[in-house]
Curated annotation (Swiss-Prot):
Pfam families noted in UniProt: Ribosomal_L15e (PF00827)
HAMAP family: Ribosomal_eL15
Superkingdom per UniProt: Archaea
Organism: Thermococcus gammatolerans (strain DSM 15229 / JCM 11827 / EJ3)
PANTHER family tied to this protein: LARGE RIBOSOMAL SUBUNIT PROTEIN EL15, RIBOSOMAL PROTEIN L15
Keyword Ribonucleoprotein annotated: yes
Keywords, comma-separated and alphabetical: Ribonucleoprotein, Ribosomal protein
Biased composition (Basic residues): 167-176
Family: Belongs to the eukaryotic ribosomal protein eL15 family.
Location of the region described as Disordered in the Swiss-Prot/TrEMBL record: 164-194
Stated name of the protein: Large ribosomal subunit protein eL15
GO MF annotations in UniProt: RNA binding; structural constituent of ribosome
GO BP: any one term: cytoplasmic translation
InterPro entries listed in its UniProt record: Rbsml_eL15_core_dom_sf, Ribosomal_eL15, Ribosomal_eL15_arc, Ribosomal_eL15_CS, Ribosomal_uL23/eL15/eS24_sf
Length: 194
């Protein structure tokens, strides 16, 4: 087995491998950090590489913390019955991973989100690492593997559901029977997709 296969096997079931102990120690530190943190190198090198990361200029890796559970909506100021407040049981219709990608994109508006992956969770939070690319960097522009991201069509791609997590949330992994309301978009089908 090659190095990447060993890493992948260890991360398949973190609690049973050496990753579990490492994660416990890391999370103590991660909880005290800001929500969005730029990091030097990926925690899961195998996953990052398979999702398009390269150790070269123009690539940035960001760790994002997202609160678990449904959406906490702002409280109404006007009077009403507590049951009609509309505070609870309103999910954001997006995965936490997609939300993490959006947080990273807002923090670094000059970069585009390439992809992301899970790195840990506890009772309150989930952590994701987001691979970001600088579309204006000459190294990125001259690399035929990633130069597509410099095009106008990919500007703000995470906010339009064009990343892998976004496409999954929009139901675009399914086709055929049962997926009639998925394409061309959720909005075009008047929200019947979800």
């Amino acid at each position: 087995m090659g190095m990447y296969k060993y890493i992948r096997e260890a991360w398949k079931s973190p609690k049973k491998s050496y990753v579990g102990e490492l994660l416990k120690k890391r999370m103590i530190k991660w909880r005290r950090e800001p929500v969005v943190v730029r990091i030097e190198r990926p925690t899961r090198l195998d996953r990052a590489r398979s999702l398009g990361y390269q150790a070269k200029q123009g690539y940035v890796v960001v760790r994002v913390r997202v609160r678990r559970g449904g959406r906490k909506r702002p409280r109404w100021k006007g009077g009403r019955k507590p049951s009609k407040m509309g505070m609870v049981k309103y999910s954001p219709k997006k995965s936490l991973q997609w939300i993490a990608e959006e947080k990273a994109a807002r923090k670094f508006p000059n970069l585009e989100v390439l992809n992301s992956y899970w790195v840990g969770e506890d009772g309150m939070y989930k952590w994701f690492e987001v691979i970001m690319v600088d579309p204006h960097h000459p190294v990125i522009k001259s690399d035929p593997k990633i130069a597509w991201i410099t095009g106008k069509a990919h500007k703000g791609r995470v906010f339009r559901g064009l990343t892998s997590a976004g496409k999954k949330g929009r139901g675009l992994r399914n086709k055929g029977k049962g997926a009639e309301k998925v394409r061309p978009s959720v909005r075009a089908n008047k929200g019947k997709t979800k």
